[in-house]
Amino acid sequence: MHDLAALTPLGAAAPRTDRAGEISVTEVTDRAIASVSTRNGKAKPFATAAKALFGIEPPAPGLSATGPVWTLIWTGPDQWFAEAPFATHEDIATITKQALGDTASVTEQTDGWVRFDIEGPTAVDMMERLCPLPVRRMKTGAASRSIIEHMGSLVICRAEGRHFSVIAPRSFAGSMHHALMAAARSIA
């Protein structure tokens, strides 16, 4: 029998937190992710089923919405990432698909992405060095696709001016971490 051990996207046994000045960069591994896409002609039944499952309305373009358990992040027309605690939603795709039925297409995404949380009073200064988004004007709940160091990413404002999440393909975890820390050190 194989003796396998789960590793974080950065290749360690536990998530990593690094600090530079007033900024912390934390690898987030306790969230499950599924992509959710409304099926053609199913917008109304999807809206009803989604509200029942998530407890929140799917957000409009450029936004995320957070409820007691779930966070929905707009990723494209009629598409969202659904996040929930990994401890209770390890099988997030099955949970989501069973609740939404034929109103949506659902795909497991947890192991395909890395999430880093950037927190601190100078988070905006750091993010301005990384991506072309107007991060200084982003309000809590704003979400947008962007490019960071040539890597496609999703940037979410969790708390205006001081807490952002960056979600990028897992295969870029090391490169993204390096870019984030270089920017954090540049303002430390």
Model-identified regions with their sequence ranges:
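Basic, glycine/lysine-rich polyanion-binding surfaces/domains
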Residues: 1-188
